[in-house]
Amino acid sequence: AVIFGGISREHELSLASATDVITNIPKDKYEVICIGITRKGRWLYYPGDVADIATGKWELNPDCTSAVISPDPLHRGIIILENGEVSIRKIDVVFPLLHGKSGADGTIQGLLDLSGIPYVGCGLLAAASCMDKSHTHMVMDDFGIKTAEWRLITQRELSEIDECCEKIAGELGFPLIVKPANSGSDAGTSYADSPESL
């Protein structure tokens, strides 16, 4: 199964990833079950064309129907709710192609672990740890793994943002890459080459 979409602001990136993966899975060897998650968090079984995933039109398909992951390891699969009837589609493995919140933060990995469904990618702890960039840097530092110089500005420090920016510019110099600690991909990332742009 391929799970795509999601509630994060990286929804479109997830659709692009899913399109690439689905397109490259050999259909003569594997049956691909597509589960899309709308921006509002609705889970839908999607039996339509992969091209509509790329454009975001997939959720308008009248053949979409509500779906959830079975939490019971004895009934491993996707529960599809259609016309008042429930069916389970057994699955062998999941490609969780969600990005950002509820996808790359360990949430989907935890759900799949609970359900006993194997999946591609890192596990819950690694995903959760790596979603928070400051936490990742601290872990790497503890293990003596070199990373780029970095500084964290906390919510409390935002009231003194000018002083924080001045201190960071003095310690690190320019140019700087500014990134939210808890966003995936390049969401919210900016380039600062001066105190004003920082």
Model-derived features with residue positions:
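Intrinsically disordered, low-complexity regions enriched in small/polar residues
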Residues: G6, V32, P47-G48, G121, ...
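Residues at helix C-cap/C′ positions in short coil/turn segments immediately following an alpha-helix
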Residues: D28-K29, L172
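Hydrophobic, aliphatic-enriched repeat segments that assemble into extended interaction scaffolds
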Residues: A1-I3, Y30-I33
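Conserved N-proximal alpha/beta basic substrate-recognition cap immediately N-terminal to
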Residues: L15-T19, K27, I33-Q155
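Active-site nucleotide/adenylate-binding loops and adjacent lid/helix of ATP-dependent enzymes
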Residues: A1-I3, S8-R9, A16-T19, G84-I88, ...
